């Protein structure tokens, strides 16, 4: 955002639950006014799929007029008609580490919290366009 002199805005709505329908309703609310943003980063891929549907119905070209990124990398996002750019969490690593921590707690009576930082991966597909920093 800094490189392009953009300020992120957070959009909360009564429709912000993590579902396709929630994303659809949220987008219908967001798209009622003229777009003053270049991209939407949805909380989940399900929300992004709903946003994609609403944008299509309202004639908003993704990625031509609006870039869209989801979060989760669910399998449907790779379908050619969807082709959603998303963020993939290291789910398998998360599961293995959670089981290891639970086993350690059961076997050794370990107390407290463990702070882990796991790096996500950006999966670049077809719903984002490159911005020109000179504009």
Language model regions located:
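Bacterial carbohydrate/catabolite-sensing allosteric modules
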Residues: 1-135
